[in-house]
Amino acid sequence: MSSSVAHADHHHEETFLSKYVFSMDHKMISKQFLITGIIMGLIGMAMSIAFRLQLAYPDTSFPILEWFFGSKWAPDGKLDAGYYMALVTMHGTIMVFYVLTAGLSGTFANLLLPLQIGARDMASPFMNMLSYWFFLLSSIVLLSSLFVETGPASGGWTIYPPLSALPKAMPGSGMGMTLWLTAIVLFIVSSLLGGINYISTVLNMRTKGMSMTRLPLTVWALFLTAVLGLLSFPVLLGGGLLLLFDRGFGTSFYLSDIYLGSAGALEHTGGSPILFQHLFWFLGHPEVYIIIMPALGITSEIIAVNSRKPIFGYTAMVISLMGIAFLSFIVWGHHMFITGMNPLLGAVFLVTTLIIAVPSAVKTFNYLATLWRGNIRFTNAMMFAIGLVSFFISGGLTGIFLGNATLDIQLHDTYFVVGHFHIVMGCAAIFGMLAGIYHWFPKMFGRLMNKPLGYIHFWFTFISAYLVFFPMHFMGLAGVPRRYYAFTLLPEYGVWFDVNVVMTLAAILGGIAQIVFLYNFFSSIFIGKKSGTNPWQANTLEWTTPEERIHGNWPGEIPTVYRWAYDYSNPAYDEDFMMQNVPDEGVEEELFETSKTKVNKSAKKPKPEAVTLFTLIKNWLKPNTI
Amino acid sequence: MTTQAPEQTGRVNPKKFSLWLLLLGILMLFSGLTSAYIVRKGDGNWFDFEIPSIFLYSTIIVLLSSITMIWAYRAAKKDDIKGIKLGLSATIILGTAFIISQYMGWLVLSDQGLHFVNPKYGDKVSASFLIAIAAIHLVHILAGIIYLAVMLINSFRYKIHKKNTLQISMCNTYWHFVGFLWVYLYMFLYFAPDF
């Protein structure tokens, strides 16, 4: 296409502002999303360590807490009970929306969609830029609520009324809640602008030969994620608007004549707080898949590349993603089993929920089958991808427990739920995101991340994540409720004190491991080893772009696609990978007569090296090579 | 703006496609709200009332405005600048009339004792629902009128003609969508007491 040439002609000088700040280049926007996501992630993690300290040592004074949060929120080095709730709420909000929705989808959809489908940029680069700026604004508004006098929102990230609908319900329900709602409205705008763009880009801007069945699974996952966001976020917006009417104008959509200790009975009558739960979880459940699906897509890609094998069951992977996407809209009731729901309706939600196990199991099976007898390269990204598979299994199994309406009556609002969703959604998605960062870091910055530091990061994070979240299941089975400030007043939970201490120490260990990651990430931008164009010998189109990462992605024509994304270890070729833009064998034969001999030579497959602990350690100790 | 046109491979214009996706999102917003209506009604303690007839006039006005919009769009395709201006102006006037008519509808409701805020009458949340749904819809109509005004200004600058119909065709799509969205909402609210 000639536009690329024309593009080079009127390439204007870029200033610092237009290149790094008000950039419309999808690669720069992806970095902006990533860095903002990392900062938000650190804040969310710091909060979790603060309240874990409280849970493990409810009676101990930590001067550092007072120094950090001030004497109002942590008098005498002990977290204030109300502020504990605020921290839990903000931790949930930040992690769910700001890190794992915007940080994950925003980063990788922006980076990978145009590069992997062969487009010069998004359908609307301007909307893309707006999407980031709304996200940043939303983050700032949310964080600013930490500094208001009455404290940030404290009613849980699910903002159930009446705590969210009644400004006088508790301190955090006032200004903090207003800022929370403002931030989320901005966030929804950002997410819709981004999502519309992603869908439009994938459907309309694929390069020649890139049929939907040749798309890498990352693109499929990010595409379906965007569809989920587009269909579910507006419903939350509707629910949020009714909430704003209740807060601001005094309507009674969600509020009824409940009795408040301080203010007596409310003036509202007839509102239904359960209605809000329906509207919230109609978004809330797809949101869980908005979080996990990009991570699954990233994992599919990384596992195939590093096993040097085609992904097992490509079509099944796509269909299972679609199945998960579809089912996610008809399972929201499983968050509400104990709201006095009609048992028949509960049974329906139970069945739809358990059906999700089918596509999820298909995906897990396919990951394992791809790994099976693969020529596995244990890169940092691969470790995190395998970590995701581990979390997806162990967290998914507990999902089957919780999906049972009868069991859920016992387990609801206990630590079992906390353990379940942190493993299957929190850890799995974070590991997917980290895997993506390690894998596509060379594409973003042209350098490799330090490998030994990556292994340290992986093992400490992996072990600490299981140490923190696995015991929670046992606590939940014993009936320990979530969201309690201190268990000192409840002697029946005394047996869990030591466990709480172990979990907190593990959380701190996990936090320290992230410092290793941060050092590795930021130092590698400047001093990492140069990566070359295709460091992982992958097939997808992003590795055909030049190292300079130019505006418009490809200096000449956009490559044409001749094959699917997973032509690894095909015995017909010399190399164990065949990039998507390399013409078919038939076409090749016309150009080079020698291709026949190639076939015979490479038909003999080398015997894969047996993976032993020794070879694993040997590989990890190697410097940055692959 | 961007330094290069996005390369297409012979599919629908990405901008137009993005608009369709936006409309899909808006549709989900209103399906959420009308579902909330049904769920809340199912809980009981609900005051059923007939939707005032003035909302029928709104519906007729918004349908008429769709016809004038078609007129403007056809004029654009025929390079009839005067027709574009007249059609767009008529659509803006009808859109404004729709807003006034909706507002009068709320006044009629108010006369019947059905306010947006009905403290102590929990069953009259039905009226809050009607007004909230209509108001959120009205915001979309307002956005449509702004869009139409931009188109009108562009037509005075001769930016809309036979060879540049993308903008007006997107505006056309949006306006029909919000119009028919109201028709759906009206029918929903009309038949809702019988659910």
Q: Residues of each region from the PLM?
A:
Chain B
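...captures the hydrophobic TM-helix bundle architecture rather than a specific catalytic motif
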Residues: 1-195
